[in-house]
């Protein structure tokens, strides 16, 4: 995994960074894992022991297969290695099976597939402008970017403690972005098409890909003022892109189309019967909306303005994944969230079309699409913030304003999954790892932009420092108060709402910077 190196002054520092974080991942193998561990074990069993015609129908476990076909084939491939570790993990009826060999296999499968992420980071480093490079290795943008991505705290806790496979999926996305910077548009489009059929959450950033490829690849030239030169449109390029999407989709969905199972597959991929918010509210607009509704309902009950018998039984803080009704405010439907998400994305997509800024403009639009979907999407998971945090790392080493936005977004976004790791042994691990990553991120970017104005104003500094008292209250004070029994949801509510404020601020600040940036005003041949 550490084979991808960038030699600087005779030292293979990239390999050292990759090897170091790999060793840390190995040390995290015995830590707590969530129900996602059983989810993926069950998918191994389904794809290994059942014919393809039953993959999206099997429901022995509540953790049914709900990822696109490429991920199902990925699990199928892993299962043929898993059988040499413990054959019993591949039995569909062995629910909640977790032997020591199963643990080792699943943990190492995540570590091994992270090789793609390492390679993608290596390729992204090639796209970084080295003009700001300092004399010291640790002050070079490529070194800072490598550390921010390879040692990303969010990926470490979500993949290697909580348990998921975000590393190699993020690697596909970063590699696709790198190919655009390298003007290898067809390859970038192919990688993204493949990624969509691994995990459909990346549909959120598809508008950025579609508009950028149409504007900057299918149209081969601009006028002097940056507007489109309409006679430069290439039908050949458009057909080539369409062919890529068609062939990848046919390879993924073709077998299920032949089995007349596409409706069943899509019903698994888009389960709208789940509630607006996850069991733990993702820190987005709907968390603020739901928290306001919760406050109004508590006040209404205390003042006897609401009838307790008429309050919906499906509580948003019960930890259950189900549909629910808001108590005071109007309940939100999937259609409403879709419309809000679309409206939130439109300005960024409009800027990408009307104010082309090359791959960097595409990257900004991608991040805004990811954040807009996070802010207003249906049943958003708190872990989805990584979809914006990781690509934002690339912007952070380019401009001071982007570094400021990145630090606010990543610090807040990384703190928000803390409630996922609720066991005592993981408490010092998550606190120490986040502190180390946050301190490094702030200090390295401050050094990189030391000749410019401070990265934070007083309000931003005060907000970020507030995460410390919030953690102390939630972990060490609240459990010993009388409110713990009557209002057990308060720590989750406070964490979600506080982080939602920071993420909303970062989203708005990035939007402002995109809207005021001028277009690239010269003709460019792609």
From Swiss-Prot:
It is found in: Endoplasmic reticulum membrane. The chain crosses the membrane at residues 4-24, 103-122, 143-163, 188-208, 238-258, 334-354, 368-388, 389-409, 427-449, 461-481, 488-508. The keyword Transferase applies. GO terms for molecular function: dolichyl pyrophosphate Glc1Man9GlcNAc2 alpha-1,3-glucosyltransferase activity. Pathway: Protein modification; protein glycosylation. It catalyses: an alpha-D-Glc-(1->3)-alpha-D-Man-(1->2)-alpha-D-Man-(1->2)-alpha-D-Man-(1->3)-[alpha-D-Man-(1->2)-alpha-D-Man-(1->3)-[alpha-D-Man-(1->2)-alpha-D-Man-(1->6)]-alpha-D-Man-(1->6)]-beta-D-Man-(1->4)-beta-D-GlcNAc-(1->4)-alpha-D-GlcNAc-diphospho-di-trans,poly-cis-dolichol + a di-trans,poly-cis-dolichyl beta-D-glucosyl phosphate = an alpha-D-Glc-(1->3)-alpha-D-Glc-(1->3)-alpha-D-Man-(1->2)-alpha-D-Man-(1->2)-alpha-D-Man-(1->3)-[alpha-D-Man-(1->2)-alpha-D-Man-(1->3)-[alpha-D-Man-(1->2)-alpha-D-Man-(1->6)]-alpha-D-Man-(1->6)]-beta-D-Man-(1->4)-beta-D-GlcNAc-(1->4)-alpha-D-GlcNAc-diphospho-di-trans,poly-cis-dolichol + a di-trans,poly-cis-dolichyl phosphate + H(+). One of its GO terms (cellular component) is endoplasmic reticulum membrane. It is an enzyme of class 2 (transferase). Its EC number is 2.4.1.265. Dolichyl pyrophosphate Glc1Man9GlcNAc2 alpha-1,3-glucosyltransferase that operates in the biosynthetic pathway of dolichol-linked oligosaccharides, the glycan precursors employed in protein asparagine (N)-glycosylation. The assembly of dolichol-linked oligosaccharides begins on the cytosolic side of the endoplasmic reticulum membrane and finishes in its lumen. The sequential addition of sugars to dolichol pyrophosphate produces dolichol-linked oligosaccharides containing fourteen sugars, including two GlcNAcs, nine mannoses and three glucoses. Belongs to the ALG6/ALG8 glucosyltransferase family. This is Dolichyl pyrophosphate Glc1Man9GlcNAc2 alpha-1,3-glucosyltransferase. The lineage of its organism: Eukaryota, Metazoa, Chordata, Craniata, Vertebrata.
